[in-house]
Structures are given as structure tokens and as C-alpha cells.
Amino acid sequence: MEKIKEPIDVVILNAGGVIGKTAAKITPSGMNELAATNILGNVILVEELIKRDNLRKTVLSVSAEAVPGVKMLGVKPVSMRTSSVDEFAAVLDGSYFGKKFNALQAYAYVKYAETMWTLSMARKYPKLKFVVVSPGNTKGTQAPDSLPPPMRFMLKFVMMPIVFPLMGGMVHTLDVGAKRFVDAISDERYKSGVFYASKEGKLSGDMVDQSTFFTDLKNTSFQDNANDAIHHFINYGQFFASAQGKFTGN
């Protein structure tokens, strides 16, 4: 952070993915690797930039249509019992899912937590633009590479080139996915505090406000609960690092 001398206009938070075999492994922060990779660094980066007055305009947080679900593909919407701080914390350390941890399912819940943190930040910092965007189902990325081999093969060589184009509104090129980010940053039609992604049940096409059909996104208490849960792990990680330094003499 000390090397950033000039204020930054735009930050795109695109770190993350399904991770792969180590997704459930617990990190020093207390989050599992899936949550830490998708959330931890993003949150710390943005909040440190704000603290140092080094962020001028926009934060774009990358989410996914997996949050509201895609019925045609059998992807169910994220459905939490209470969206309490404790429940979000259980998502972030993986205990929410019990012994049968499925990284693809957990990914949607982790993205929901990151999305809700972003929406909470939009209310906390009204002079900045905090917008959430899904790039949609985009060809030509390395996103499938962390999937199990059979699923990776099906997605890359069957679903993407053959099945999705036949279904309509389910896939697009890398340029189209990137344009979603550019539009959300530069076009005033896209407002702070909103999650924009494909129309309900789709993975491509026009972007719409997801809260029109996934109403939990509007719940400000849920948003703040996600924020509080994330900071539980940030504070734990900082304490852990401090304690480790004392024991090692650093």
C-alpha cells in the first residue's frame, strides 16, 4: 500500500474462482481458501485505499449469476436461513456446508457474501460508486481450469461451444464480458449499490438489477451482517499475525 502514491480512480475486484482441491482448507485468517481468495484481499485492499484517501471514484466487485440461481441449469438460488452474522461466518469458514463440502455450491454463497459487503459499502460511502457486476458466462477464460477434470472437459469442449449457444442467452465472448465491466464503471445508468447481471435464468444478454427477482439483496441488515462477518476474520487474521510475530521475535 505504501507504494501507491497517487489516488486510484477505479478498482475492479476480480480475484477468486472455485479454487479446486484446496478450497475447504482453513487459512490463518480462519476463512477457508475459497472465501479468502475471493474476499479477504479484496476487502482489505479497498478499505485500506479508503483509509488512506487513495480511492477517488469506483469499486466494481465481480459476482456471478450463481447467486440468484439459473433454473435452466439446475443452479438453485442462494438460500440462507437468517443471513445472520454467524451464518455468514459459517459460510466463510465452510462449516455452513457440513462434511459434504461442494466447492461449486460454496462458491455461490461466498460470492453472495462479497456482494452483500459491496452493497453495504455503497451505503457507508455514498460519495464513491460501489457496483456489483457478473461478467456472465464468458468464453476464453481460465475459470473452468480449477474444476474437476470431467466437469472441466464437459464445460470447455461440449457446453461452451455447442450446448450453450443452442440454448440462447447463455454464453458470450470475452469482449462482451469485459464490456460489462467497462459499462458499469463509465455509464451513469449503472448505479451504486446495485448488483447487475443477466436477466433471470440467463447467463448472457442485457444486464438487469438482480434485486428485482432476488430480493434478499435489498435487505440492508443482511448486507451489514455480511460486512461484520468478514471483519470477524480480518480481525482474527491480524491478531494471529501479530501473535505469530511476537512468538518468532519479528
How would you describe each model-predicted region?
Residues 55, 143-147, 187-192:
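Glycine/proline-rich active-site loop of Rossmann-fold NAD(P)-dependent oxidoreductases
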Residues 124, 132-146, 194-215, 247-249:
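C-terminal/domain-terminus segments
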Residues 98-104, 137-139, 143-175, 211:
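Alpha-helical membrane-targeting segments
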Residues 1-144, 235, 241, 245:
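Rossmann-fold NAD(P)H-dependent dehydrogenase/reductase core
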Residues 218-220, 224-250:
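Intracellular terminal tails of multi-pass secondary transporters
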Residues 160-211, 222, 228, 232, ...:
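C-terminal helical subdomain
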